[in-house]
Amino acid sequence: MTLRVLTVDDSRTILAMLHHTLSNAGFEVLQAEDGRQGLDLLKAESVDVVITDINMPVMDGIEFIKNVRATGQHNSLPILILTTETSQDKRDQGKAAGGTGWIVKPFDPEKLISVIQRVVH
């Protein structure tokens, strides 16, 4: 079974890097450029894991996670936060919102794949 990954980031460069990394690992990749687009995709598509940035326009990653969890439909969906943020306060906010894991940019492709495989199995 091919894992489906939703990536949410306002940087097209990061989205392209994620697409390349994840596609080469055999994952199907869906992309959104902000939290609002991410929510719309989650309403229309089934995914196995989400990777989201925190600092984005329209709807940031923390609000995105809160909204995903608030629906009650995706309580067990792994949501990984991929960000340049390193503060403990932001980590606490991400965890409190319902984030599953935290990865700091720039990311190691092998580590990212390993974390995805761990959280979905």
Regions found by a protein language model. Name each.
Residues 16-24:
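Charged docking surfaces used in two-component/phosphorelay signaling
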Residues 26-33, 41:
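Short hydrophobic/Thr-rich beta-strand motif most characteristic of the beta2 strand and flanking loop
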Residues 56-59:
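Receiver (REC) domain active-site loop signature in two-component systems and cognate sites
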Residues 67, 105:
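A Lys-centered signature of the CheY-like receiver
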